[in-house]
């Protein structure tokens, strides 16, 4: 009798994806973040589902329903903070996952990379809409400012914004539709994740050296399942430390004030994981230019495979490209810091320089470093 995991039509798919999957023997801990993202997604869907059971998407009761969850629902506070801080963990894993793809040249798997970019956009949209739901001051004004950016689109901009709002300002209709989208998008993300994995398993995983590992593969289980479980435990530990000791560390105090359309907070800013893009948006004085720069700051990932001029795939043996990569990481951290600062001297000029450097590093210095390295190696 054949083994059920190899013969059953459904279990067979799981077997080929997570058990008997041939995996390079040398992939490092940077490859753990894909599975950690899967765990974050499952955690967000479960906690979100329980929150949705008690949340009401009406402007008059949304804020108090979140307070009710924290005060009156059994373990509601921990579910709420797991969901809020789970989003931060999700984005930390996302940024590291994308960074690893950049460093080790995983972007040469075009289909996987492009689905990943779509996933990044979808997750960012979901997180933005989730931030609006508690209906605090920063929720309301964040929604107003970000949706208003669409009015920069020539000719149809104003109509588009009012269509998204469902009225002439951010109101009940906006909150209801944001809740509906925030609820459905994670399931769309799950479907996209399956497609992402499908494309990945067509080619097999990349590895740190960037060369073909066909001659040196090992089964995913037990080697990498064990390694992934260790990653899960570390991430859960970090999340629980954050949730149980300082759940408000990454939040905004303004969001504990109910939304008031008549009072603007002194500094409107999004959650920390959007600050780098927000800093790029603010660094351009022109509204349309800022919006385009904001979109391009993420969309630029799509042209990275075209800018790959090196004869080697990975940056593992390319010291010059490594310097450019870590400069880019430092620049993104600078942009994140600037995004949270008020619009005044010296932050304006620092933001503008960091924004120019961000695009220059990707569009000019990365291909240039690769070309110089090729020249050194007489390739």
Swiss-Prot record:
InterPro entries: Cyt_b/b6_C, Cyt_b/b6_C_sf, Cyt_b/b6_N, Cytb/b6-like_sf, Cytochrome_b, Cytochrome_b_C_euk/bac, Cytochrome_b_N_euk/bac, Di-haem_cyt_TM
GO BP annotations listed: mitochondrial electron transport, ubiquinol to cytochrome c
Pfam families: Cytochrom_B_C, Cytochrome_B
Cofactor note: Binds 2 heme b groups non-covalently.
Names of required cofactors: heme b
GO molecular function: metal ion binding; ubiquinol-cytochrome-c reductase activity
UniProt keywords, alphabetically: Electron transport, Heme, Iron, Membrane, Metal-binding, Mitochondrion, Mitochondrion inner membrane, Respiratory chain, Transmembrane, Transmembrane helix, Transport, Ubiquinone
Residue numbers binding a ubiquinone: 201
Top-level taxon in the UniProt lineage: Eukaryota
Coiled coil listed as a keyword: no
Sites where the protein binds heme b b566: 97, 196
Cellular compartments per GO CC: mitochondrial inner membrane; respiratory chain complex III
Signal peptide as annotated in the record: none
Protein localization: Mitochondrion inner membrane
Major location (coarse): mitochondrion
Chain positions recorded as heme b b562 binding sites: 83, 182
Membrane-crossing residue ranges in chain numbering: 33-53, 77-98, 113-133, 178-198, 226-246, 288-308, 320-340, 347-367
Annotated membrane topology: Multi-pass membrane protein
Subunit field text: The cytochrome bc1 complex contains 11 subunits: 3 respiratory subunits (MT-CYB, CYC1 and UQCRFS1), 2 core proteins (UQCRC1 and UQCRC2) and 6 low-molecular weight proteins (UQCRH/QCR6, UQCRB/QCR7, UQCRQ/QCR8, UQCR10/QCR9, UQCR11/QCR10 and a cleavage product of UQCRFS1). This cytochrome bc1 complex then forms a dimer.
Note: Heme 1 (or BL or b562) is low-potential and absorbs at about 562 nm, and heme 2 (or BH or b566) is high-potential and absorbs at about 566 nm.
Function text: Component of the ubiquinol-cytochrome c reductase complex (complex III or cytochrome b-c1 complex) that is part of the mitochondrial respiratory chain. The b-c1 complex mediates electron transfer from ubiquinol to cytochrome c. Contributes to the generation of a proton gradient across the mitochondrial membrane that is then used for ATP synthesis.
Family the entry assigns: Belongs to the cytochrome b family.
The protein, known as: Cytochrome b
């Amino acid at each position: 009798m054949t083994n059920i995991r190899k013969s059953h039509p459904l279990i067979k798919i799981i077997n080929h994806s997570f058990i008997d999957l041939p995996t390079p023997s040398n992939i490092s801990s940077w490859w753990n973040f894909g599975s950690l993202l899967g765990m974050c997604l499952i955690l967000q869907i479960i906690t979100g589902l329980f929150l949705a059971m008690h949340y009401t998407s009406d402007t008059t009761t949304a804020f108090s329903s979140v307070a009710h969850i924290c005060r009156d629902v059994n373990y509601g506070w921990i579910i709420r903070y797991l969901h809020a801080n789970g989003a931060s963990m999700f984005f930390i894993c996302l940024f590291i996952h994308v960074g690893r793809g950049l460093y080790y040249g995983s972007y040469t798997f075009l289909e996987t990379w492009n689905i990943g970019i779509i996933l990044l956009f979808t997750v960012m949209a979901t997180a933005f809409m989730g931030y609006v739901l508690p209906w605090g001051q920063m929720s309301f004004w964040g929604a107003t400012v970000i949706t208003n950016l669409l009015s920069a689109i020539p000719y149809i901009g104003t109509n588009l914004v009012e269509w998204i709002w469902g009225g002439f300002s951010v109101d009940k209709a906006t909150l209801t539709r944001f809740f509906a989208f925030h609820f459905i998008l994670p399931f769309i993300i799950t479907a996209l994740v399956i497609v992402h994995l499908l494309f990945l398993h067509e080619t097999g995983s990349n590895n740190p050296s960037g060369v073909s590992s066909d001659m040196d593969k090992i089964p995913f289980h037990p080697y990498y399942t064990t390694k992934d479980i260790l990653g899960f435990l570390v991430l859960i530990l970090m999340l629980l430390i954050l949730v149980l000791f300082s759940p408000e560390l990454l939040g905004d105090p303004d969001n504990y004030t109910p939304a008031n359309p008549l009072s603007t907070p002194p500094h409107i800013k999004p959650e920390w994981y959007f600050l780098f893009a927000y800093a790029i948006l603010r660094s351009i004085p022109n509204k349309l230019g800022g919006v385009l720069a904001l979109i391009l700051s993420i969309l630029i990932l799509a042209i990275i495979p075209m800018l790959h001029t090196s004869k080697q795939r990975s940056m593992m043996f390319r010291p010059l490209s490594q310097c450019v990569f870590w400069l880019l990481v430092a620049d993104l951290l600078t942009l994140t810091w600037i995004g949270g600062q008020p619009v005044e001297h010296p932050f304006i000029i620092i933001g503008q320089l960091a924004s120019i450097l961000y695009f220059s590093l990707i569009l000019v210095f990365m291909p240039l470093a690769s070309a110089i390295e090729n020249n050194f190696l007489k390739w």
